[in-house]
Structures are given as structure tokens and as C-alpha cells.
Amino acid sequence: MRLQISILIANLFGWFSRKVLRRAGETIPGKVLLKLYPKALSQLAKDRKILLVSGTNGKTSTTKAVTKAISTLGSTVSNSTGSNLDRGAVTTLMKRSEYVVLEVDELHLTKVALETKPKVIALLNLSRDQLHRMHEVKRVADRWTEIAKSLPDTTFVGDIDDPFVALALASAEKKITVSFGGRIHKDGAVCPSCGKYLKWSRNNYKCSCGLTNQGAEKELEDGSAAYRNAHLANIAAAVVGAKPIAINESELERSVIKNYDGVSAKLRLTKNPASWTEALAGVSSDEVILILNARQVDGIDTSWLWDISFESLRDKTILVTGERALDLAYRLHVQGIKSEVVETFEKAIKKFPKSSKVDVLAAYTAYFGLVNS
């Protein structure tokens, strides 16, 4: 009875946030419910088939793909809009369904996983992101490892071409290891298990302690991040009985095309070295706008810019804007790449003639500001 009353109150707060304050209200119900009923996560998760998705990059798009596959089995709810902290998970669980697919922030995975006891956890990747909050990658990997040890009945699905994902899966009792032929990891010089230097042979690694990406249960061809996440989504969904579905890779890219007075702009989300590298590889236009902010959700520390090669932008017309535009412009200058700093995105986009096609790589806050405007 107390839980039901708490849910009613939480929903009223959500209604007030949406209708009166004109806000999204996606996390307010969950935030209120956790205050009123701290054990809401575990209670709402009872007798439900739950799948969790976590990783530095690709969580939202992969969650959408898993949800699409799972929905063929029965009623399904998801937080695929990106509200991935514990309060977002609770808000989603407040909706009735047989299946629940949750995107979960890397640091919040411990609480959500241990309280919901999911059928499946898909671990996509792990790399430096929001250093002021995440600190070192190894810290998050150790947390994931403890989760794997604590949930013997949960099946862990992971891309072990990432040594940090491999570390977590090594401790899982039930797991499906996946390899896409290997790829270099910028943070993978040292073995996250024993601290010795990893031995890399082309794109594959192994350590004397036994950590390796070779001998995965499922060995697939290499491809883009969207391609990899599409396969991981189908593998995770198959654990609970879903049949593989065709997934258009473009659907998994965090990109939107918008028109600005005749200028077609392809907006792509970039928030850390891995996502920047992926986005840069997808730049097809000769006109590019780069937007860098450094707010809390973007990551206050921008030192990671020096981990990225911008060579693919050489000889293109590059405009740089955002709160930390000078940091980015200087980084490009050091690599010998010319750019122009412009005060705002609105002024930058107007510098291109009508019918132009422009690639826009934008920080988290800038991306969603443009998408929602």
C-alpha cells in the first residue's frame, strides 16, 4: 500500500512538472519515488524480465535496438530517451510491462543492477569520459567486475575487444563474449587485471595473466560502432528469446539532419575521444562546424582533445564555436589544421551559402540544444 501511494504522489509531481512547469518531467517521478520509498527499484523489478545496457558510447541507440527486438515478445517499456540514472530507471519501472530495457549510466550500473537483478546486462565499451566524475577507466571497470561477481544468474554480453569489458566478463558466471576482430584501445596499454603491459598484435591483445580478446564465443566481422552495437543488441535480446531483427546502422548513429535557411546540417553527438574519432570518420562534407562546451554533463576537463587525431579534417573549411572554442582551435592549430573561431553556431551556419551540406560535430549540451531548438 505504501508503495502504491508513493507512486501516486510521484506521478502527481511528474504531471505538475510537465503541465505547469513545462519541463520534460522524465526523471521527476523516479526522483520523488526514491525519496518516499528507497526500495522502489527492487520492488518494481520483481517478476519482470529486465535487460540493462551500459557503456561509454552507444547506450541510447543500443537500448532502442534491444527494445525493438524485445517488443516482439510482449509488452515492453524503456528509458531509451536517455534518462539513465537510477531515478530514470525507477520512472521507467513505474510503467507496467512484462519486459523492461534500461539504459544505465556506467557509475549507476552497480545500484541498478544489484537491485533489479536483470536477466541480461550488455556491456558495450569503456573509455575516458567526464574525467571529473568518472575519474580513471579502471575505477569503473572494477565496479563492473564486482557486479559480475555478485550476479551469478545474470547473463553478461560484452565486446571483449575492449580490455575493460573483458575484465568484467572474466568474473561473470554466465556470459557471451563477442569479438569483432579486434581494435586498438587508447587506454589499453596496461592490463586492467594484473597491471602488466598488454601484448598487442595488430588489433588483438593478450596478457600473461590470461586476459585476451581471442577465443570469443561469437567472432564477427569488424565494422562501425553502430554495426557493433546492432549485433550486441540482437545477441542480448536473444538471451530472453527474441529473434534477431534487421537493424539499420544509420538508426543507431546519434545524428540528426536539420535545415538552416537552405543549409543542410548533419548534427552528430561528440563527447569523448571515442565518439569524436567515430564522428570524424563519418565526416563526408568539405564544410565542418565543431562545437565544444565544457559544462558538467559535457565534461569540465577538455584535456582529452589531445588524444584525438584531427588529420581527416585537413584541407576542409572548419568553423569552431562553443564555450571552449579556443581550446579546440588551439588543438587544431598544433596539428597544423586551419580553422576559424566564430562566436555562435547561428553565426557560423550563416557563413555557408544556401544548398551547402555541413557536418556539425557538437558537444553533448550543444547537440541537444540544437536538436531540440
Predicted stretch roles:
Residues 4-176:
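Phosphate-binding loop of NTP-binding sites
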Residues 102-129, 168-224, 252-253:
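Extended acidic/charged loop-beta regions that coordinate divalent cations
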Residues 103, 124, 157, 229, ...:
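Residue-level signal for inorganic ion chemistry
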Residues 106-108, 160-165, 323-326, 344-347, ...:
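Short, polar loop motifs at secondary-structure junctions
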Residues 185, 263, 269-343, 365-366:
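Active-site beta-alpha connecting loops in nucleotide-dependent enzymes
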Residues 233-270:
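Gly/charged, well-structured mid-domain segments that form the phosphate/adenylate-handling core
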